[in-house]
């Protein structure tokens, strides 16, 4: 099964647009994708649902715990050809200032998902390369596999 998390350095970077476009492309190819959103957000899953015509599930490590998130992911990907999980906020931004618990990275680590990083290059050029380099090396296994 094809699996990917769509994440970004910050909110407002285009994660939801990329996620919905990817879900539609996978659906058009007959892969029956499952859609997920990190955290308790209910707005972005409504956009996912409008593309797929099936529910998008929330994966919230803070509220549900790691084992429940694993179980929900396994249950709702059974029989699917692909799974797309949209990250939350900035990739490493967790529930507390300076912490990464319940961040998109935390969920990607937990579920062993490869990460596609969405970048919003407005007003920058070489600085974007420095930002990506920092994100790749910030954690031993960033799980970032593409931009």
Model-predicted segments: where are they?
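ATP-dependent carboxylate-amine ligase catalytic core
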Residues: 2-13, 17, 23-111, 119-143
């Amino acid at each position: 099964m094809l699996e990917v998390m769509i994440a970004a350095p910050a909110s407002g970077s285009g994660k939801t647009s990329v996620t919905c476009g990817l879900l539609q492309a996978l659906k058009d190819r007959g892969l029956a994708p499952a859609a997920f959103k990190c955290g308790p957000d209910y707005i972005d899953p409504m956009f996912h649902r409008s593309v797929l015509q099936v529910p998008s599930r929330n994966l919230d490590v803070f509220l549900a715990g790691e084992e429940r998130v694993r179980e929900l992911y396994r249950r709702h990907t059974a029989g699917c050809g692909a799974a797309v999980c949209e990250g939350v906020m900035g990739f490493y931004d967790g529930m507390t200032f300076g912490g990464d618990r319940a961040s998109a990275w935390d969920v990607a680590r937990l579920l062993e998902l490869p990460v596609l990083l969405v970048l919003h290059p407005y007003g920058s050029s070489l600085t974007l390369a420095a930002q990506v380099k920092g994100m790749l090396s910030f954690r031993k296994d960033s799980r970032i596999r593409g931009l």
